[in-house]
Amino acid sequence: MSDAFIAETITITGHGGDEIEAYRAMPLAEGSRGGIVWIHHMPGYDRETKEFVRRLAVNGYHAVVPNLYSREAPGAAPDDAAAAARAAGGVPDERLVGDVAGAVEHLRSLPGANGKFGVIGHCSGGRHAYLAACSLQFDAAVDCYGAFIVEDPPEGMPKAMKPILHLA
């Protein structure tokens, strides 16, 4: 297996048809691949988050992280974008789910996509991964130490769903 990959900033269609920034990494070798949506933490779409996405590509996955703060502070440094998002009250749950759905649709469109998709989030992104997994069809979900996940279950949350791994 080759560990060669390509990583780049792209535009995807998010909630409400909005065009949002995302960072994608994918292996160069041909083959059938699962896709993973990585959801960033409150400090945002930073260098460390992009490194997680690159590591997934090295391990054979198509991976993308949508910039959830694209609307509040387009092109801003991660810390400034995070501050703008916090000042606006954070990312609304409905918009988050729509942006993640857009990321999945992007992954689905890639050559070699095998139709299997997972979502991973860390810190506040862990909460977001949980919410996305409750609302969208994922084959796997990982919540990496997301705190204060929900006060009440999201409306329409299935009573039975695939296991969610919570790392704390």
PLM feature spans:
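N-terminal cap/leader regions of alpha/beta-hydrolase-fold enzymes
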Residues: M1-A168
